[in-house]
């Protein structure tokens, strides 16, 4: 079932499976979101939780304090992208998705949690907020959360990919870990300079 929010500038279509966007169009009908092509990438905008990226052989080991270690299996980018969320409309331009841990999830991720994702249109922008709650006060809950949207680029004729860039809210300086695309693994100990007091990141196919 398609879930639609809109304002005078944008219309966004989403689905309950994975609480993910499936279309972003402007008032001129221009489609901004990648429409999924398995030749390149069949996804569109998955939500990543409780891990981002991959762990070796999909195997995670939990070592809680004063308790035996526990082993679970979590696929690349986590499991909520394959789960159906509940949802409710906040307004014509905003929708909220929620999901809670299930018995099935607890088999491999032994933490009771709730995840709430809200999409809100603000003029020509989409604000996305994430609220993760640990429902077990007696123990810490390790997790990561991320967004993985794909966009059509270029959007218009006579444009090229390199005409586009990402712009951050403020100037950023950071390093990134060594990556291994074939496995999706990262070497967190081997880091390389990436941004140096930059607010914009130019796009390229490297």
Where do the language-model regions lie?
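Short, hydrophobic/aromatic beta-strand segments
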Residues: 23-25, 138-145, 177-179
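Extended, loop-rich substrate-binding clefts of extracytoplasmic carbohydrate-active enzymes
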Residues: 70-123
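Beta-strand-rich N-terminal accessory domains
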Residues: 1-66
């Amino acid at each position: 079932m398609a879930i639609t929010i809109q304002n005078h500038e944008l219309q966004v279509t989403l689905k309950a499976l994975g609480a993910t966007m499936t279309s972003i169009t402007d008032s001129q009908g221009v489609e901004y979101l990648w429409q999924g092509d398995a030749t390149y990438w069949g996804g569109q905008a998955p939500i990543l939780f409780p891990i981002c990226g991959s762990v070796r052989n999909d195997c995670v080991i939990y070592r809680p304090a004063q308790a035996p270690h526990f082993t679970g299996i979590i696929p690349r980018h986590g499991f909520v992208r394959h789960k159906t969320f509940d949802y409710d409309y906040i307004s014509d331009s905003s929708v909220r998705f929620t999901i809670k841990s299930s018995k099935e999830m607890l088999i491999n991720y032994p933490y009771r949690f709730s995840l709430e994702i809200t999409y809100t249109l603000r003029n020509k922008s989409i604000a996305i907020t994430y609220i993760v709650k640990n429902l077990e006060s007696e123990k810490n809950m390790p997790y990561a959360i991320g967004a993985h949207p794909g966009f059509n680029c270029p959007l218009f004729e006579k444009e090229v990919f390199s005409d586009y860039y990402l712009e951050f809210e403020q100037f950023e300086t950071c390093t990134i870990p060594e990556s291994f695309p074939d496995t999706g693994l990262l070497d967190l100990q081997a880091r390389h300079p990436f941004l140096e007091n930059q607010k914009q990141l130019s796009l390229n196919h490297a």
